[in-house]
């Protein structure tokens, strides 16, 4: 909980949680730019305030989400099959977040910063296919000159 400043609406990304040999291990982020601050939207701050208020003795050392991605695998698989939709991985939510940001016109540089990518080439190489083809827009713009 200490990595979230609800008053300032900021999440400080300073570490990474890895699962190694059935143990949770906290490590530094993979890259220098992996250490970053993420500004949180109002709706998420409200959700976090509500969630944290339900945790007994929540303090700066409290790990807010004790669940592991491994423990989500089987329920996700089961309910995806019931709903007859493709199963998504937790990491796919990150991909969806980027797709939404692109759709809303957020610049690739801002997205790279938010994701903690050291180089914009990583962002564009991974998510470049999500950018809409703007050739018609460009031609129309040039027609106005």
What function would you assign to each model-found segment?
Residues 44, 72, 120-123, 138:
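Hydrophobic side chains within well-formed alpha-helices
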Residues 38, 52-67, 73-113, 117, ...:
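Short, basic (Lys/Arg/His-rich) helix/loop patches that form interaction surfaces
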Residues 1-4, 112-118, 128:
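A short, basic/aromatic helix-end/turn motif that makes direct DNA contacts
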Residues 18, 22-28, 125-145:
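DNA/chromatin major-groove-contacting recognition/catalytic segments
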Residues 1-50:
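Conserved tyrosine-mediated DNA breakage-rejoining catalytic core shared by Y-recombinases
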Residues 31, 96, 122-126:
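Ser/Thr-centric signal marking residues that sit
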Residues 8, 52, 124, 139:
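Short, flexible helix/strand-to-coil boundary loops that buttress conserved ligand/catalytic motifs
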């Amino acid at each position: 909980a200490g990595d979230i400043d609800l008053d300032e609406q900021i999440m400080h990304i300073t570490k990474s949680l890895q699962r190694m040999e059935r143990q949770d291990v906290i490590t530094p982020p993979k890259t220098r730019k992996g250490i970053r601050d993420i500004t949180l939207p109002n709706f998420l701050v409200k959700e976090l305030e509500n969630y944290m208020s339900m945790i007994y003795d929540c303090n700066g050392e409290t790990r807010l989400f004790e669940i592991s991605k491994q423990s989500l695998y089987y329920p996700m698989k089961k309910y995806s099959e019931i709903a007859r939709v493709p199963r998504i991985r937790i990491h796919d939510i990150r991909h969806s977040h980027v797709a939404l940001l692109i759709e809303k016109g957020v610049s690739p540089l801002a997205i790279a910063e938010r994701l903690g990518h050291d180089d914009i080439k990583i962002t564009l190489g991974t998510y470049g296919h999500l950018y809409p083809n703007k050739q018609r827009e460009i031609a129309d713009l040039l027609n106005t000159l």
